């Protein structure tokens, strides 16, 4: 009987219902059975409607080669009293609101009143799922939102927005109204414009002014350069030395500068080359793309969340796959709003990416749209600084990774660096997942202004987003679980790369906390009038930051895969649910971000290296170019991060070695081009390398 026939027979059978523990050491994520509709592939088929039998066959083939998993006891850190006392509220200053038309304001205030009263009379199924924000706030006992001191310095230094509107540089007709093709015929133009008033989003500062400000980095010493606005020639050409310094807490300055040059060519320079020099598109079109992409991401977030939490779909799986679905569903942040409350999101299936050429450009280059000064200039003060800071720190992190990881010098990667990269991936996956949930709820609220669903009131609660980053206890728990235990603190203190990666995670934490709080403030309350333009800017800034977060996450995936599969390192470990969580995020965010597989990433890096004439070597530079750069200032910035969690429950699951889950990691996070390299490792033959064959 065919695989499809077996799947039909299984759909007719019923599964046993258990109450599983979400953190069993023998999680079915680790055990990949053979066959078509069982285990991981059966689960993915149910959640994503995967109907390609070739995926199932590949999964069975890879599962037969996979070594038995190693079971590890989960290590839990205990927050100290000092860290808890340091978790204090530090929120961006409030800005003045734009007055709204009187009729629209009155309608919004009445809708807000209905939402507030709905919290007590509606069944709880809000932004945080079954958790009531009032109960969460009662357990917080103090703010867990601890902004980066470097970010606060930059925010305090930032001047106010220009008092008068700034003219667009795009020429006549440069302020298009919001258009979302996937909602065509279901939402009128005025309704969509009320939800996303692009015609009111004039530049808050001049693009040239924002370009100059992006080159300033308060508190950053020489060697850790801020993100520029064009390619620069600070790095030496020729050999790029990847040997680790005698003190792993520092970088060779020359190699770091070369890594920063490579990072700029694969991120900011690539997007600016496509937008400014080739496509000749405009920041206003980029904002139109963001609105369309964010609505599609919201639809996909709702679809994925619904499939994760629909009990009826368990009948299509065997017991093992149904167990996996239940375990992950109990931990995921994707909590869909009821279909009746969001008919515009729930009317169809998953939303594909926009097919236009401009959209393809905006999705490319590792999510680097926020490196465009003209786009950042359209954001308000706090959101603009948040996007700029996230872009700067993720750029520095990308440069630092490319100064330590390269297919031509795999053996130079230190175990401590590979181990910490896995922990960073854990946190990035949780941050991305929670951001997708936030966008799904917020877009649902803006497209359905008369709905009284409690989730819509949750995302407008200032107190919730002042107390927790993204208003989520799960984000705080994941950050502390991955970066707050004794092992993680030791890894941070003994590696310069780890300090830079930790600072990048902290920057994304700070930026997302800032823009989501800004949205809650813009929604108004009894003391403040609603500001739809400011709220729309906060949503767009969140989309920009999420796109760059995904680009950094793909970079980390490429480095983890390189160390584990090409270098044979056993150091990289991830949470049990991290590959599955990140795969769900990548599915949902396809309209916003074109993912980069490890093979594609290293091919782009190799092309950039050839462009600037760099050749990797496993040696160390000699005097007089053997000077070092110390990122110790970032360790000082990280003193209060991560904040203490609300409880000791695991969000990530038991840690597993990446080499022990080869098949799952490849199927979920890597392209088909890596299959040959993985099979070579399993069979004991010499691997050909994830980035293509090595140079002779």
From Swiss-Prot:
Miscellaneous notes: Expressed in late in the infection.
Compositional bias (Basic residues): 1-15, 70-81
Entry keywords, A to Z: Host cytoplasm, Host nucleus, Late protein, RNA-binding, Transcription, Transcription regulation, Virion, Virion tegument
Region feature (Disordered): 1-39, 54-130
A Pfam family reported for this protein in Swiss-Prot or TrEMBL: Herpes_UL47
Protein localization: Virion tegument; Host nucleus; Host cytoplasm
Recorded domain comment: The nuclear export signal is CRM1-dependent.
Protein name per Swiss-Prot or TrEMBL: Tegument protein UL47
Bilayer-spanning residue ranges: none
UniProt biased composition (Low complexity): 87-103
Lipid metabolism among keywords: no
Keyword Transcription regulation: yes
Extent of motif Nuclear export signal: 650-673
Function: Tegument protein that can bind to various RNA transcripts. Plays a role in the attenuation of selective viral and cellular mRNA degradation by modulating the activity of host shutoff RNase UL41/VHS. Also plays a role in the primary envelopment of virions in the perinuclear space, probably by interacting with two nuclear egress proteins UL31 and UL34.
Principal cellular location given in the protein's record: virion
Record PTM text: Phosphorylated by US3. This phosphorylation is required for proper nuclear localization.
Motif (Nuclear localization signal): 70-84
One of the record's GO molecular function terms: RNA binding
Gene Ontology cellular-component annotations: host cell cytoplasm; host cell nucleus; viral tegument
